[in-house]
UniProtKB/Swiss-Prot annotation:
Keyword Metal-binding among record annotations: yes
Protein name (database record): Iron-binding protein IscA
One Pfam family cited in the UniProt record for this chain: Fe-S_biosyn
GO cellular component: cytosol
Biological classification of the source: Bacteria, Pseudomonadati, Pseudomonadota, Gammaproteobacteria, Enterobacterales
Organism whose genome encodes this protein: Klebsiella pneumoniae (strain 342)
GO process annotations (BP): iron-sulfur cluster assembly
Amino acid sequence: MSITLSDSAAARVNSFLANRGKGFGLRLGVRTSGCSGMAYVLEFVDEPAAEDTVFEDKGVKVVIDGKSLQFLDGTQLDFVKEGLNEGFKFTNPNVKDECGCGESFNV
């Protein structure tokens, strides 16, 4: 099982954590949403729960709850700039289908 980050994603997360002044790492999860069923959730976490799984890549701790892990195993998190837009991009090998707007996915 693994979660990986690109260099740009790791730099961005570390920058956010430094500006925030505290935090254990980044929580990555899924929630029911959109036309394809699931959407990604990113939030800072100050302390992982006992049932969480913690991955570390490039100095960033990524925390995932047990329910989300089955849908996220093998995911790579990247931070990309496209024109005037920038944001996190997920490359998830478990995704079978995505909605047209790119906001949700199905596994």
